[in-house]
């Protein structure tokens, strides 16, 4: 009965709609019935969305009018009809089978059913995008309840959701805050708590493994917590490029634009990969403008300051600076210890404070490497059946510790500082006391104290045979200047990033 009812409705739609619209949107739909359920299959996500948005209210009206008051349960899915029915999901009348079809409910507040004449008018005014369309949701696994239509009443048990690709484990609650990331965390929270009215765009930059992606996911998760129906999409910049290439291949660039410009928040990681991709930059430029003009939130990350991204158009660099640009720095010692203690607590592992301090002193580059080292220590402890001690840490991380000592040496620090300040290494070792030499020398000594395991006398010895009190004075002086002098603070951060990345 349901299939015959559907065919009757299709014939009525054929009379109502222009031939091109009917052939593009209605004819490709396939249908199968099981009991009082009518399953309508669209060939891809875009056709499904378009039918949902433009024609569903009229379809439901026709089913109700010609179903003698017993309209079937209607399910819109992506795929094609099969001999075997999709499996039912718990708490939902219908769910998509793994790879052949996926359930996709329509919007939560369907428009009132229009009259036949208004349906014709609205349909005629609709833009006609490509039929062979880009499917930005391909491979999504979310399963939702179908639409129900009963006695002129449309009850929607689920809402169509963009796949967010967010990692639910990255939240503000488990983000360890310290001086190095305090401003970035505060800015991210402001955006999450007050989107569209805070900083737009928010641009986070810094080296790998410092927490930029964590903060970005935390914002997205908080936005969805506040509004589960929000369209929040996270992706790597290379995914944006791949989607655009796919859209061009399918002659479906309009669908690509429609998808990315319809989100409430767009979160793109590693924006530096847009460099020298002219068509991608062109498309993102217009997408970026459309989102900001529409009041939608944009968050971007990069491994460097936007002005320093070579191969990126100046107009993009300029727009990235419209909102707030914040650096995420390598964590200082106290923050590294706090991260280790928190991760150990989450893993329900007893990590002595002195052991955490030992690891944090030697693993300085980024949080990702720090967590990796802790996992190795925990695994070693578990397999050996021993408590975590400094001795066990030395055993489990011996290759990593040896590599760290080799990479960050006093010689390397002296060479890097000399290049940065455009002086000679011999100047750092000389007795010259002019500020242009003395200040870089003090910076190099402070970095040597922080990044190596050498004692103060050993550091003084390799800086021209200076006394350990001279090294101590240099370290204290640089710490004071980092608080009061923005130039010294920026120089020190840049050098620290260079030496530990």
UniProtKB/Swiss-Prot annotation:
CDD domains on file: AAA (cd00009), Bac_DnaA_C (cd06571)
Annotated function: Plays an essential role in the initiation and regulation of chromosomal replication. ATP-DnaA binds to the origin of replication (oriC) to initiate formation of the DNA replication initiation complex once per cell cycle. Binds the DnaA box (a 9 base pair repeat at the origin) and separates the double-stranded (ds)DNA. Forms a right-handed helical filament on oriC DNA; dsDNA binds to the exterior of the filament while single-stranded (ss)DNA is stabiized in the filament's interior.
Comment block on domains: Domain I is involved in oligomerization and binding regulators, domain II is flexibile and of varying length in different bacteria, domain III forms the AAA+ region, while domain IV binds dsDNA.
Region described as Domain IV, binds dsDNA: spans on this chain: 382-501
Similarity remark: Belongs to the DnaA family.
Keywords recorded for this protein, A-Z: ATP-binding, Cytoplasm, DNA replication, DNA-binding, Lipid-binding, Nucleotide-binding
PROSITE patterns: DNAA (PS01008)
Subcellular location: Cytoplasm
InterPro entries: AAA+_ATPase (IPR003593), Chromosome_initiator_DnaA (IPR001957), Chromosome_initiator_DnaA-like (IPR020591), Chromosome_initiator_DnaA_CS (IPR018312), DnaA_C (IPR013159), DnaA_dom (IPR013317), DnaA_N_dom (IPR024633), DnaA_N_sf (IPR038454)
Binding site for ATP: 209, 211-213
Biased composition (Basic and acidic residues): 122-134
Region (Disordered): 103-150
Family annotation (HAMAP family): DnaA_bact
Region (Domain III, AAA+ region): 165-381
Ranges of biased composition (kind: Low complexity): 103-121
GO molecular function, one term: lipid binding
Source organism of this protein record: Pseudomonas fluorescens (strain SBW25)
Gene: dnaA
Residues covered by region (Domain II): 91-164
SUPFAM superfamilies: P-loop containing nucleoside triphosphate hydrolases, TrpR-like
Protein name: Chromosomal replication initiator protein DnaA
Quaternary context: Oligomerizes as a right-handed, spiral filament on DNA at oriC.
A single Gene Ontology CC term: cytoplasm
Region annotated Domain I, interacts with DnaA modulators, chain positions: 1-90
PANTHER family: CHROMOSOMAL REPLICATION INITIATOR PROTEIN DNAA
GO biological process: DNA replication initiation; regulation of DNA replication
């Amino acid at each position: 009965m349901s299939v015959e009812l559907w065919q009757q409705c299709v014939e009525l739609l054929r009379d109502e709609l222009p031939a091109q619209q009917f052939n593009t949107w209605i004819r490709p739909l396939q249908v199968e019935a099981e009991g009082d359920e009518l399953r309508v299959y669209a060939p891809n996500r875009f056709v499904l969305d378009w039918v949902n948005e433009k024609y569903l209210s009229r379809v439901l009206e026709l089913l109700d009018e010609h179903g003698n008051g017993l309209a079937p349960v209607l399910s819109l899915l992506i795929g094609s009809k099969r001999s075997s029915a999709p499996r039912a999901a718990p708490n939902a009348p219908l769910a998509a089978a793994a790879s052949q079809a996926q359930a996709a409910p329509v919007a939560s507040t369907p428009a009132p059913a229009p009259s036949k004449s208004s349906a014709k008018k609205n349909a005629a005014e609709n833009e006609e995008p490509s039929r062979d369309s880009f499917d930005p949701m391909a491979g999504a696994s979310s399963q939702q309840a179908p639409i129900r239509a009963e006695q002129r009443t449309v009850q929607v048990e689920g809402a169509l959701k963009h796949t967010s690709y967010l990692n639910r484990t990255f939240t503000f609650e488990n983000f360890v805050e310290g001086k190095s990331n305090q401003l970035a965390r505060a800015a991210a929270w402001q955006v999450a708590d007050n989107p569209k009215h805070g900083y737009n765009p928010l641009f986070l930059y810094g080296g790998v493994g410092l927490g930029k992606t964590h903060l970005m996911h935390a914002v997205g998760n908080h936005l969805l917590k506040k509004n589960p129906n929000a369209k929040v999409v996270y992706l790597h910049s290379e995914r944006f490029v791949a989607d655009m290439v796919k859209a061009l291949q399918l002659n479906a660039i309009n669908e690509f634009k429609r998808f990315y410009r319809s989100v409430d928040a767009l979160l793109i990681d590693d924006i530096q990969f847009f460099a020298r991709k002219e068509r991608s930059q062109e498309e993102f430029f217009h997408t970026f403008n459309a989102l900001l003009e529409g009041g939608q939130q944009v968050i971007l990350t990069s491994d460097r300051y936007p002005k320093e991204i070579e191969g990126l158009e100046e107009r993009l660099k300029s727009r990235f600076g419209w909102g707030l640009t914040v650096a995420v720095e390598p964590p200082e010692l106290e923050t590294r210890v706090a991260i280790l203690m928190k991760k150990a607590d989450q893993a329900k592992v007893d990590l002595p404070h002195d052991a955490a301090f030992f690891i944090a002193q030697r693993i300085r580059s980024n949080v990702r490497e720090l967590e990796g080292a802790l996992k190795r220590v925990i695994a070693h402890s578990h397999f050996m059946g021993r408590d975590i001690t400094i001795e066990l840490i030395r055993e489990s991380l011996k290759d990593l510790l040896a590599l760290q000592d080799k990479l960050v040496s006093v010689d390397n620090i002296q060479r890097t500082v000399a290049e940065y300040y455009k002086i000679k290494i011999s100047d750092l070792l000389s007795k010259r006391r002019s500020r242009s030499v003395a200040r870089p020398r003090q910076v190099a000594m402070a970095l040597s104290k922080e990044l190596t395991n050498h004692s103060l006398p050993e550091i003084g010895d390799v800086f021209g045979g200076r006394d350990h009190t001279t090294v101590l004075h240099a370290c204290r002086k640089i710490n004071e200047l980092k608080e009061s002098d923005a130039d010294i603070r920026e120089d020190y951060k840049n050098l620290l990033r260079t030496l530990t990345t």
